[in-house]
Amino acid sequence: MSMHDPIADMLTRIRNGQQAKHQQVTLVSSKLKEEIARVLKEEGYIQDFFTETLPNGLKSITLKLKYYHGRPVIEFIKRISRPGLRVYKSYKDLHSIPGFGVAILSTSKGIMTHVSAKVKGVGGEVICEVA
């Protein structure tokens, strides 16, 4: 069975892993997933992540989930732009996310938060929102 939206799958695994109080989640790796994980780590939503090559040649990425006083640090994580409906924003249209959250964007200068994109004056595809 093919997966139509691997980013939505990644976000769902994070959401489900935190609801089940798992310490980590593992999924098939890609450059985009690694960059999203890097932004989540920089923003303090996950403890760490690492990639490894499996014996069958596939790369996997493991995300170490983060909790604060037993509660998940990520209150919500939502896919915005999806294969059937791409969402693009100019840097002028980037607004704050409720609850001190961030939007993660794919821009011409790489994957970054909406705050970084606004400072650099670039817009792009809004991948997801996290708070």
Curated annotation (Swiss-Prot):
Transmembrane segments: none annotated. GO terms for cellular component: ribonucleoprotein complex; ribosome. One of its GO terms (biological process) is translation. Keywords: Ribonucleoprotein, Ribosomal protein, RNA-binding, rRNA-binding. Signal peptide: none annotated. One of its GO terms (molecular function) is structural constituent of ribosome. One of the primary rRNA binding proteins, it binds directly to 16S rRNA central domain where it helps coordinate assembly of the platform of the 30S subunit. Part of the 30S ribosomal subunit. Contacts proteins S5 and S12. NCBIfam families: PRK00136.1. Belongs to the universal ribosomal protein uS8 family. This is Small ribosomal subunit protein uS8. It comes from Legionella pneumophila (strain Paris).
